[in-house]
Amino acid sequence: MTIAERFAEFLMGTRYDEIAVQAVDHATMIVASTLASAACGRHIDSSRIVSEIEIQRGGTPEAAVWFEKDIRLPVIGAARANALMSDAAASDDSDLRNIVHAGTPLTATALAVAEATGAGGKDILAAIVVGYEAAGRIGESIMPKFDYRGHHGCMGAAFGPTIAAARLYGLTAEQAAHALGLTATTIGGLTKAANTSIAREYHAGNATMAGISAVQAAMRGYTAELAIFEKERGFCRLFGGSDGSVILEDLGTDWDIVTDMALKLVPGGHPYHALGEAGANAAREAEVAPEQVAKIIVSRPGMKNLTGPLHPKNLIDMAHSPAYFTAAGVRDHEFGWIHASQEKIDDPVIHTLIDKVIVGPEPTENLAAYRQGATVAIEMTDGRTVANTVFVPNGAGCLGVDWADVDEKCRALMPAAPLDDVKIESVLSKMRQFRTLSHASELTGHLV
């Protein structure tokens, strides 16, 4: 059997009651987190444009466009529009290995297909867990060369919606293997486009469409090259220089949604969260005022210089500016959702501190412990120095995620939808009961 066939057998054959409780909890949290990010992103131009396109295109009313009253579209159109909403706000989740936002296309796909098929809470959550496993393992099989070569993380993320849709549409393992093959030959994306433009969230929509389209074709008998992952000049060889065998290693011993997933509990790019967190921790510990700062030294494995925009002017700049995260954390002794606001992005005190951020020597100890982690040292004008290290950012599944933090995120972002306090609490109540829902519309119906 090929890698695709063996992997599909595992992904399609795993039952809900065989999945660890923590994995199911994290899947539920991903749904809540994705909806919160979507509420914040629905008015961003990229999201608005794609929603308008899909609404104008129309078609069979199978699934809801989130936060839109009485607008239902074909599964693929609704899922694409909803994925763009969430990814546009850059406030969803990440795989700590490669910063792929796997949860957004997964949630958008799972809820849309479930609305069309009548699937309930347990089936949706199982589809998200195994979909995350598909995205994570296939993404890992092409690390790190896919990134060095300029390919975007959607190269792995697309396999999440593929498997989620395959399960919820009721495909056989063989059909799912062909769907994986079709997705492998479809998906593409460039990191350079994503780092500096709204093409980033366009990738999320493409990953969602690629997965659903592959499944809808495979369920009707469309076939693909089943050896596409291990074949010479196939997916893994071409994008990662590997034989793809890592995809099948130790299947079922743990779940990527537990070991490698991280929810965003603050805005912006996940690689920079630890910088904001460590900067805030250090400044708070020593009660550092901005005018006392002489120099801010940042370090992490592999960090040679400050990347991204040094002085951000907008949300896209802010999301990719490690200097901003660091300076904002030092300035305010915390880093939170408020730091995605234009008021904070324009804060002159933060910009003064940005000019004091420099890159120090790379750490030499505990290198394996740095999972998107960082160390920040603040040198003060009186000669004192205070430092803090964050090995793994808050919100990482491996640290455990508290529902209170997810609730806080939803309460902070969902008013932008807009949803009032009563609606938000209703959504949060449904999330806590998600396992018992008999139909996805019991949740999506509360989003208007």
Each model region followed by its residue ranges:
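Histidine-centered active-site/metal-ligand motif
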Residues: 101-102, 151-152, 273
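Short connector loops/turns at beta-strand edges and beta->alpha or beta->beta junctions
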Residues: 86, 105-107, 133-134, 185-189, ...
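Terminal-appendage/accessory-domain detector
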Residues: 1-99, 195, 199-209, 213-448
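Buried hydrophobic packing segments
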Residues: 34-35, 106-113, 128-135, 158-169, ...
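Hydrophobic face of alpha-helices
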Residues: 24, 28, 32, 106, ...
